[in-house]
């Protein structure tokens, strides 16, 4: 029992040391922005969690339409889960086909179960990570998701939707994400609407690229960019 406690203490100590290596960002003061809505909205994460790498990039489809597309790195990350899980399931099933057919036990299907979990996780990330994120001046709206405004009877059915005139500003904020063995900053780009509601656009770990994309989007929309990452 003592060795387990020592191991737990070591892991906790290691995590604290890793966290100490991450620079602590200054707290942003919204009063530095002379705008009443900036004082009213939240400056905490709109979408908890994130990624340590760049998951999306802004692409100009034409002069009146911009889209955030998943990066090659993000697609490969999702595919690793799908491919690894598929290989594990096929390899184990092929190697143990005889025992699987003659006797059914939890130990026999456990590796296959874990393989399917990897496939499902990869499929889940692919489905949501590659969903369209569109700013369209033709339709005068923004939407994020598999369903666009033309596919629903009422746009109120869409969770992540806004008409472009309702967009008041863009917001960049940071979030310190901690896992068991690692910690990193992820950065959100959010829309701020005229009613104070926020909609998350993208959330990833490359602040330099996010700022460039946000500035391009700010110019495209003609809306101010509020950058809270100090």
Language-model features and meaning:
Residues 59-66, 137-139, 195-196:
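Short, solvent-exposed coil/turn segments at beta-strand boundaries
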Residues 2-6, 15, 63-134, 199:
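Alpha-helical transmembrane spans
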Residues 206-230:
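Cytosol-/stroma-facing membrane-proximal "stalk/adaptor" domains immediately downstream
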Residues 3-6, 26-39, 49-54, 58, ...:
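Non-transmembrane, membrane-adjacent beta-strand/coil modules in membrane-associated proteins
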């Amino acid at each position: 029992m003592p060795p387990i406690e020592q191991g737990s203490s070591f892991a906790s100590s290691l995590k604290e040391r890793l966290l100490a290596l991450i620079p602590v960002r200054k707290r942003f003061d919204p009063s530095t922005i002379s705008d009443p809505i900036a004082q009213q909205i939240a400056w905490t994460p709109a979408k908890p969690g994130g990624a340590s790498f760049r998951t999306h990039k802004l692409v100009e489809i034409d002069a009146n339409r911009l889209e955030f597309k998943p990066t090659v790195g993000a697609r490969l990350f999702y595919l690793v889960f799908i491919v690894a899980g598929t290989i594990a399931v096929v390899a184990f099933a092929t190697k143990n086909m005889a025992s699987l057919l003659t006797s059914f036990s939890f130990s026999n299907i456990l590796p296959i179960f874990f393989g399917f979990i990897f496939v499902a996780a990869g499929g889940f990330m692919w489905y949501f990570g590659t969903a369209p994120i569109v700013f369209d001046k033709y339709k005068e709206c923004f939407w994020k998701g598999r369903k666009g405004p033309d596919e629903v009877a009422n746009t109120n059915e869409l969770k992540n939707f806004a008409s472009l005139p309702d967009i008041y500003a863009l917001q960049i904020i940071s979030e310190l994400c901690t896992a068991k063995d690692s910690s990193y900053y992820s950065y959100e780009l959010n829309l701020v609407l005229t009613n104070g509601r926020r909609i998350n656009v993208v959330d990833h770990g490359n602040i330099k690229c996010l700022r460039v994309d946000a500035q391009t989007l700010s110019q495209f929309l003609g809306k101010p960019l509020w950058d809270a990452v100090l």
